[in-house]
UniProtKB/Swiss-Prot annotation:
The lineage of its organism: Bacteria, Pseudomonadati, Pseudomonadota, Gammaproteobacteria, Alteromonadales. The keyword Hydrolase does not apply. F(1)F(0) ATP synthase produces ATP from ADP in the presence of a proton or sodium gradient. F-type ATPases consist of two structural domains, F(1) containing the extramembraneous catalytic core and F(0) containing the membrane proton channel, linked together by a central stalk and a peripheral stalk. During catalysis, ATP synthesis in the catalytic domain of F(1) is coupled via a rotary mechanism of the central stalk subunits to proton translocation. This protein is part of the stalk that links CF(0) to CF(1). It either transmits conformational changes from CF(0) to CF(1) or is implicated in proton conduction. This is ATP synthase subunit delta. It holds the Pfam family OSCP. It comes from Shewanella baltica (strain OS155 / ATCC BAA-1091). One of its GO terms (molecular function) is proton-transporting ATP synthase activity, rotational mechanism.
Amino acid sequence: MAELTTIARPYAKAAFDFAIEQDAVDSWAEMLTFAALVSENETMQPLLAGSLASTKLAALFISVCGEQVNVQGQNLIKVMAENGRLKVLPAVSQLFTEYRNEWAKEVEADVVSATELSSEQQQQISISLEKRLARKVKLNCSTDAALIAGVIIKTGDLVIDGSVRGKLSRLSDKLQS
């Protein structure tokens, strides 16, 4: 994965810089997300791994994407195809999203709770995280009954484990040491 990120970084950075220059960050994010989905399609995978000429591969890829990809996006696809890098489009899209979130001072937080969180609870978590991180927070909520009760919040390198399962695990570790 680190190798894919290293390969994808220059493409993502160039696309992001261009998107800022053109004031089209959101449309580029949508375009790259769509192109990444196309590259991950099971029908497209063998073509990306195959020996199809780069110009034919780029033309095929662009025709599949259709109007979802503008002229500048098509140029990026052509350059990536020439360099045999279309298979890293998902990593390019992910890095682009990270650059966009950093630029917009936004962060995504994964919140796993034992039970479904109410909208009020989600709002309280969001407000607390926004104060702590000094960024706008978008929550991705899911449930896991194995937590027993409480929540686990993950964003970037920060992990807040407020679950009963986590507390029991830490207590067990203390008792065993």
